């Protein structure tokens, strides 16, 4: 009876693990679409300056002047960038991977990687698997010259080639970029911030990030950070 119970318990446990894995893949296939959480467009003001003295980074505020996101980089071109919320909690971690020194690829993870628990190998691999991969377009490849980067979803099926989930077109250098989904619909946009007075100019250090309904603002800001690493 004991052996039979253990066998049944193991089967149920493995089934739950498989179910959780399928659920995680389904969530990854949807991310960063967050239907029902953002019903109107959100406009954020992005300041290319850290709140910490002697740091490179970003400060992001909403239309009411409230701090939403912050980034503090202690080196100019880091291989890891952490997006934090207003209280300093990590939202997303981005890590750089280079292939042959040509392709600039960044993998996006939920939360802060360094502080994750190590309870089991299964949970560890699930937490440490990236959500998305953002790759800079290589200019020598044929295609749309307006494209700056591609966003790919990452799944457990590493052998299957996937089309980009999102395409980033425009010019980050001039702060005129759009993030387009597979149907070429704009889900986020980087725009220059217009001043009320003609005598005032914000330049490229202060700009706007407009996030359309249904798209994750945190991931939209992560794209801004990666474009800055790729093109600044």
Show where each model-derived region lies.
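Low-complexity or membrane-interfacial segments used for flexible interactions
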Residues: 1-69, 73-79, 86, 103, ...
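An anionic oxygen-ligand recognition environment, strongly enriched in 2H phosphoesterase
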Residues: 107
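Polyanion/phosphate-binding surface patch
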Residues: 69, 91-93
